[in-house]
Amino acid sequence: MWKKRAIIWLCLCLAGLMVLLARLTQLQIVATEHFTKREINLLEASVSQRSQEMILDTGRGNFLYKDGTPITHQSKPVLILFPFLKKMDWDSKRISEITGVSEYALEYAVEKAKKPFAYGEPNPIELTKPQMEKINGLQIPGVFAVEKKYHLVQNPAEHLIGITGENETLLRNRYPDKELSSQTMVGLTGMEKSFDEFLLPDGKSKLVYHVDATGGPLFGINVKYVEPANPFYPVNIKTTLDPNLQTVVEQLVDQHGIERGGAVLIDIETNSVLAMVSRPAINKDDPFNKENGGTENLMLKEQIIGSVFKTVVTAAAIDYELTNPSRQFDCSKTITGEPDPLFQYGMLDFSTSFARSCNNTFATIAKELKEIDPNILGNYAEKLSLTGSVGWIGDIYHFEDFKQLQEDKGRIFLSEDAKKDNNFVALTGIGQHEVRATPLAVANMMATIARGGTKEMVRVASKVEYKNSTSLLDFKEQEIEGDTLSPYTAMKLQKLLREVVVNKNGTGRSLQDLPYEVAGKSGTGETGRTLGDKPLYNKWFAGYFPFDKPKYALVTVRLGATGNTSSASPLFADIVKEIYNHDHSQN
């Protein structure tokens, strides 16, 4: 009997050992980086448990203004102190003399510290180069003067640049073949998302020391400096943004109380974005809550553009010879032919109709174009780069059709039947019904007209640079494929857009006295939404300047505004003034 019991006992012991061995194999070999449903990385957890570190740079790539200055971060020379200093006699007096910080303050900060820190955080004291050299020359263990990268609390162009975050599931799905730490930051929106694979870190720069269970040094007081071995990484994305103009436009958008909307400024020569601002601002505590602002860049989302679309109707009307100067339109009537209770403009020619934005004129023209060919308005919207992708797209390395921007494409009609319906076509002719376009596309339309009809892709980045500032790749200027306006039609549009401003009754007459001569078009899109009993509108002004030698295309828009809210023209005017001052301060 005892033999049988012994055998059973031995079998149980062997089974237990096998279970333990299987568990140990799972922990140390099979699931070291993806343990349990929570996907715990045991290697990282082990290192974290027995060491403390001060991250100086996450290693993720950076975004730069066109002049090379950083947009999203700032490197500061700071004083790093390690908590094990409290257990040793260190020369706090000498550090005090060099930094100007009291000896008591230094020792008190170390005493309450549980991990390495930059003295003075969240607003650390910034050291001079001589101070850094003196501190490091003392060679005090646990005391370092180093450069540490800080992300700016208020990022300019925050919607355009986008945000990052830790999301291991997204990381594994996006890069299944890459060996990346579970704590690797990934781009979630904007350019951070578009350029994410370029920006992935090669490793962190950090100060590390090993600790025992009490937090004391495990292997003496040696602190290791760890940095990526590749001197070319991380790479930087050089944007086309101008630091001064971006700052000015941000300030003016806020000064004008734009709650929803913003502005887009394009360099016409290179067709590059110089400034882009979207409001509401991103709520850092809850960025994806749309009620608190959300992360959507409204300058890249399709919007109702109202009378701005009359520019497209006009281009088609010019080519199909529907703008005879002797022709008169009844601008005291609505688009249905009924007497207009609000606007009694009388009989106007086409040029004056455009300047005063007469709805009946453009509803009539749109219906006449429909009789010639129902596709004309859609075709001309494409010719003016108002619809379709307008951001830079191209093949680079192993990326096919790499897109710098995540943008809506806009639309004119939703169905073939709508193109043939007189009522829908009349509404389309004045930029209502289903007409949608992004503010970026509207700005690009103005740039296209100012260039004489050549339509180009809009760039927000000019190149990807290695860490040492040498070029990895360039995003060259590229034209958009497809039909274009003739130079003659573009010239006629230029004159009509200028008439909007110089005509004493033009909708842009408030812009007559600006230091730069402006050409452009206003728009008031009916959203179909209300605030209480008040209808809400999208208020636009889109144009370019200087008129004789076009340099800038600008769109300002106030979205979802009540009728008594200011138009977008005052913001447009103030931006033009500041750009004029900027240009002449450099001369």
Residue ranges and their predicted role:
Residues 302:
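Extracytoplasmic Gram-positive cell-surface binding/anchoring modules and repeats
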Residues 59, 224, 267-296, 305-306, ...:
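Beta-lactam-recognizing serine transpeptidase/beta-lactamase-like catalytic domain environment
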Residues 1-285, 378-383, 559-587:
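Periplasmic/cell-envelope proteins involved in peptidoglycan metabolism and beta-lactam response
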Residues 41, 49, 296-297, 359:
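Asparagine-centered polar/low-complexity signal
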